[in-house]
Curated annotation (Swiss-Prot):
Name assigned to this protein: Glucans biosynthesis protein G
Ranges for region Disordered: 492-542
Stretch forming the signal peptide: 1-17
Listed Basic and acidic residues bias regions: 500-524
Family: Belongs to the OpgD/OpgG family.
Gene3D superfamilies per record: 2.70.98.10, Immunoglobulins
Keyword flag Cytoplasm: no
Keywords: Periplasm, Signal
Cross-referenced SUPFAM superfamilies: E set domains (SSF81296), Galactose mutarotase-like (SSF74650)
Gene Ontology MF terms in the entry: carbohydrate binding; catalytic activity
Organism annotation: Pseudomonas putida (strain ATCC 47054 / DSM 6125 / CFBP 8728 / NCIMB 11950 / KT2440)
């Protein structure tokens, strides 16, 4: 490795620590300069290769960074190839210095890929992987990969790679076109033998943005990445995406495949979950629409949001190769107050599973001014234990099923009636605790583009929850249709309890309470009840209690 000068990082006789401020200084300096697009130094044989050939280039694990050191984490590297045609700079940070990890073609086996060794000796790496013994103590497995733009993917114990996170999104789904900032340089702290975390710094650059990022990786059953970011804009943007997630949804029970397929579902994520600042929980099943769809959910100070994979049984996917049931959900937990803004969901048409077509991010209402730094911090959970990120005291949506709407005739034959039916199963411990004859009812709202022809709720003994059947007749098929539903029930209003005088002894307090209760009873018999008191028929006053998260679905246009 080549040593890099540490000007300004330490003074004589003093210890120093590389930190986010060092990367932010670089980002600030870059922001004041004209953007320079990265230059590719990749020979045509690598740039024009097909994916199958790119896969033949194999990194030699025995030559991983820190392979001979007693560190819990190791690094392996991606070779350039295909559209990964621009090198990134990768540095190692130790207690005393920063050194660049130089490209070495001897770390790779090229198979039958024809190439001239002279043209590869100064190429540089396209990205890197983090290795850690997450599944077996004697086996280094990939737990994080950083490759392309500002993308990174992470897994926990027993997971397989699925959706991705990004550093920043700019003007996503706008007619002007999206700008993809990229991580151009990394600094990785060399871990100590007993360390359970790995710290990675990254420098971000794009035509209209620069930024400094600190990613603290903590592997486990759920792997966590703590993200600190400090970003500068070179110029104004129209839409800013903070904590962006990118995933894939091809089809599933709420939008079955149009082509006969043995798989019941094919997706990396099935829904967007939002925990709003006001405490509301919302669940939005994903679609693969025929036209670009953008949904904005206004939220102030979000408590969390994420793209989730709730179905965890092999039978939900039936795919022995891709194991969608093992692909993690990603949950964003903001640190601090993020203010007013929206969680935005972008759904893009795709014909196959090779294209990521789902994007979700936080979009601040007030956009930062160019040149002024803005900071966001959040914890990113990669999990297959979704109930941990659902309201413990509310039921949630177990599944959404779509079907052709029909009516059962007198001869018991079902006759389609031109409607579309949605069956929504609400489940969870909060609902299972209720008796099956509990007076649970649905609370629904449907946009102007549809007429509700059935709203039926019944107990589901298989889930110990309730199944909502909602049938709609769409008015204009070329328009999308919004709908929402939640389950509620009436519960008695608890009478207000009088405050006790702290100076009274226990006996006096007990006597005063009893005396007051008698007077209250006499008064209740003599006086007319107030508007919010118990009804005159003797029934208890009630209030409506929300039992579940809100199911929010958009039926795409032209379906």
């Amino acid at each position: 490795m080549a040593s890099v000068a540490l000007v300004g990082l330490m003074s004589a006789g003093q210890l120093w620590a590389f930190n986010l401020d060092d990367v932010a200084a670089k980002a600030k300096d870059l922001a004041g300069q004209k953007y320079e697009a990265p230059k590719s130094n990749l020979p045509a044989v690598f740039r024009d290769m097909k994916f199958a050939d790119y896969q033949k280039i194999r990194f030699l694990q025995e030559k991983a960074e820190w392979a001979k050191d007693k560190t819990p984490f190791k690094l392996s590297f991606y070779h350039q190839g295909m559209h990964f045609d621009t090198p990134v700079k990768i540095n190692e940070v130790t207690a005393t210095k920063v050194e660049e990890i130089k490209y070495d073609p001897d770390r790779f086996e090229f198979g039958d890929v024809p190439h001239d060794p002279e043209t590869t000796k100064n190429l540089g790496y396209a990205g890197f992987r983090v290795l850690y013994p997450i599944n077996k103590a004697d086996k280094q497995d990939e737990i994080m990969t950083l490759l392309g733009a500002s993308y990174f993917r992470v897994v926990g114990k027993g997971h397989v790679y699925g959706l991705s996170a990004r550093g920043l999104a700019i003007d996503t789904a706008l007619p002007s076109g999206e700008e993809f900032p990229r991580f151009t340089e990394f600094w990785v702290e060399k871990p100590k033998p007993a360390d359970k975390h790995l710290v990675i710094y990254a420098l971000l650059d794009s035509p209209r943005s620069t930024g400094a990022y600190k990613l603290t990786l903590r592997p486990g059953n759920d792997t966590v990445v703590d993200v600190q970011s400090r970003v500068f804009l070179r110029d104004h943007v129209s839409r800013l995406g903070i904590a962006p997630l990118t995933s894939m949804y091809l089809f599933g029970p709420n939008q079955p495949s149009k082509v006969l397929n043995y798989r019941p579902a094919l997706h990396d994520s099935e829904g967007l979950s939002i925990h709003a600042g006001n405490g509301e929980w919302l669940w939005r099943p994903l679609n693969n629409p025929k036209h670009l769809a953008v949904s904005n959910f206004s939220v102030e100070n979000p408590r969390g949001f994420g793209l989730m994979q709730r179905q965890r049984a092999f039978s939900d996917y039936e795919d022995l190769d891709d194991n969608y049931q093992k692909r993690p959900s990603a949950w964003i937990e903001p640190k601090g107050d993020w203010g007013k803004g929206s969680v935005d969901l972008v759904e893009i048409p795709t014909a196959d599973e090779t294209n990521d077509n789902i994007v979700a991010f936080w979009s601040p209402e007030k956009l930062p001014e160019p040149g002024k730094p803005f900071e966001y911090a959040y914890r990113l959970h990669w999990t297959i234990d979704e109930p941990k990120f659902q309201a413990p005291d509310l039921g949630w949506v177990k599944q959404t099923l779509r079907s052709t709407g029909d009516v059962k005739q007198s001869n018991l034959i079902r006759q389609p009636d031109g409607s579309v039916a949605f069956l929504v199963d609400f489940a969870g411990p909060a609902l299972a605790a209720l008796p099956e004859d509990a007076a649970v009812r649905s609370q629904i709202s449907v946009g102007d583009n549809a007429e509700v022809v059935e709203n039926n709720l019944r107990y589901n003994p298989e889930t110990k929850g309730w199944r909502l059947t909602l049938r709609l007749k769409v008015k204009e098929a070329n328009k999308s249709t919004e709908m929402r539903a939640a389950l509620v029930r009436d519960v008695p209003v608890e009478p207000a309890k009088p405050a006790q005088d702290a100076k009274q002894d226990k006996a006096a307090a007990k006597h005063a309470k009893a005396e007051k209760a008698v007077k209250a009873e006499q008064s209740a018999k003599a006086e007319q009840p107030a508007a919010d008191a118990a009804p005159t028929n003797g029934a208890l006053a009630t209030t409506e209690k929300v039992l579940t998260e809100t199911w929010s679905y958009q039926l795409p246009a032209d379906e």
